[in-house]
């Protein structure tokens, strides 16, 4: 935002919601007015504003099931339906928050990041001898990490990617190319250090921590025991989820246990001195579970958010869309209750990753999100406790169609746009070398004071 220099008056207007939001359903309108001293280059696009005086239109505002933010000022007098929806949303949020805090008491331990450290890190960036905001998102992320770590002396040298491995009962419905045995094989390959993410992690000095949170197989084809496999952390809650078209994927107790296993994994990482983490996953069928969650949480048509996963043909994609549409029909009523929805159709890998994000916020460790599965988990964690969003760093906008709308819902921008679809945390691990380079500039670069040149003035428009 920036100071407009004078009072901006737009008068009375009609505001039409372009999607379902807390204040109105899609295409419903309500009255508002607008005046402000500050302006923004990013005023939002979730509402269409129609000016009463001349019928001119513009896009403005941000809206979701729990948020309204924007320049149009809403007044409840004469907008009784909007007022009623607002109060209903408040009461529902209060009820859900109370239930969630009882099930996951760690949510009440989360505090906001250190804003003083954020401001000092911004000031440090502005003092470096380079164009203002020249490193773009990388500057913002290093600044964010300063706020998380409560210091301008940022450290990201001890790092790990936590890969939650689990099977999904929905594979019974023919929505994948391969069977569940692949999950166990790839998970053990990670433990052996020979999977894709391991090769990439070696380049960035990142430890790989594969976690068995719900692998279906007890043994590999050669008889090797999966539960005791060396360097595969055993936190198994159940032997894969159930087919959610027949019954809920897991019980509430199993869901909460999986979330807590993720929190405990971050607690262990904190004790070992890790100062930044990444999220990854492995589980046949998990693009179906994650896309179904995204479709319901964001109220989007299955066709708009469903991708081919690990390479489905046209008939396989059609079947996957049908399964997700059926999930929405069966469980769409839980759109405002993320834990119940996750219990009903989610995977144990997603539940464990929700715990990782919660743990990152509890223990003050930044967490880099990977692709669509990890980002759905991030959205659920943020719905449980909005402060968690400040602890999450986005790595890439993957190939799955749901990725962009998920990132938009979190208010985040991806650094990497490379149509990634590998999983395992590979996209998140790719972020670490980029962060290293940005941090080197942050720490070591010449400042304007060093060369006795006046710094650029920040007008807030870069």
Give the positions of each predicted feature.
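Cysteine-nucleophile active-site neighborhood
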Residues: 1-22
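Short, acidic Gly/Pro/Ser/Thr-rich loop/turn segments
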Residues: 22, 39-42, 75-77, 168-172, ...
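Hydrophobic transmembrane alpha-helical segments of multi-pass transport and channel proteins
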Residues: 26, 74, 78, 368, ...
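Catalytic beta-strand/loop cores that center a nucleophilic Ser/Cys/Thr
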Residues: 16-64
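Short hydrophobic-aromatic micro-motifs
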Residues: 32-35, 67-72, 163-164
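Acyltransferase
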Residues: 60-99
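Hydrophobic, well-ordered secondary-structure elements that form the walls
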Residues: 1, 35, 73, 424
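N-terminal loops that bind phosphate or other acidic moieties
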Residues: 98-462
């Amino acid at each position: 935002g920036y100071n407009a220099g004078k009072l901006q008056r737009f008068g009375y207007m009609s505001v039409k919601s372009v999607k379902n939001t807390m204040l109105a359903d899609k295409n419903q309108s309500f009255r508002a007015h607008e005046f402000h001293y500050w302006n923004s280059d990013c005023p939002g696009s979730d509402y269409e504003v129609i000016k009463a005086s001349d019928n001119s239109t513009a896009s403005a505002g941000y809206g979701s099931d729990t948020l309204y933010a924007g320049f149009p000022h809403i007044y409840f007098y004469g907008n009784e339906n909007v007022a009623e929806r607002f109060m209903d949303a408040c009461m529902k949020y209060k009820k859900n928050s109370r239930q969630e805090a009882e099930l996951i008491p760690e949510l009440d331990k989360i505090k906001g990041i250190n804003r003083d450290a954020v401001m000092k890190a911004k000031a440090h960036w502005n003092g470096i001898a380079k164009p203002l905001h020249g490193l773009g998102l990388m500057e913002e992320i290093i600044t964010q990490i300063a706020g998380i770590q409560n210091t301008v002396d940022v450290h990201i040298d001890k790092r790990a990617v936590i890969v939650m491995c689990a099977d999904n009962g929905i594979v019974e419905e023919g929505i994948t190319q391969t069977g569940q045995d692949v999950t166990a094989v790839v998970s053990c390959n990670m433990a052996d250090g020979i999977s894709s993410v391991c090769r990439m992690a070696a380049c960035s000095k990142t430890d790989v921590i594969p976690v068995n949170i719900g692998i279906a197989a007890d043994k590999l084809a050669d008889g090797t025991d999966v539960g005791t496999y060396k360097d595969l952390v055993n936190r198994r809650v159940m032997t894969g989820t159930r087919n959610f078209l027949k019954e809920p994927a897991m019980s509430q107790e199993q869901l909460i246990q999986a979330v807590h296993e993720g929190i405990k994994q971050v607690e262990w990482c904190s004790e070992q001195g890790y100062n930044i983490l990444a999220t990854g996953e492995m589980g046949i069928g998990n693009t179906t579970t994650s896309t179904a969650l995204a479709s319901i949480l964001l109220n989007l048509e299955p066709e708009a958010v469903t991708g081919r996963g690990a390479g489905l043909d046209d008939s396989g994609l059609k079947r996957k869309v049908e399964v997700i549409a059926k999930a929405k029909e069966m469980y769409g009523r839980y759109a405002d209750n993320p834990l119940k929805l996750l219990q009903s159709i989610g995977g144990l890998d997603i539940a464990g990753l929700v715990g990782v994000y919660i743990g990152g916020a509890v223990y003050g460790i930044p967490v880099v999100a990977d692709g669509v599965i990890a980002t759905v988990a991030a959205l659920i964690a943020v719905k449980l406790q909005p402060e968690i969003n400040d602890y999450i760093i986005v790595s890439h906008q993957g190939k799955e169609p749901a990725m962009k709308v998920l990132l938009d819902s979190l208010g985040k921008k991806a650094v990497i746009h490379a149509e990634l679809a590998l999983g395992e945390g590979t996209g998140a691990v790719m972020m670490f070398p980029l962060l290293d380079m940005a941090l080197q500039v942050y720490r070591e670069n010449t400042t304007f004071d060093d060369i006795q040149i006046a710094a650029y003035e920040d007008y807030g428009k870069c």
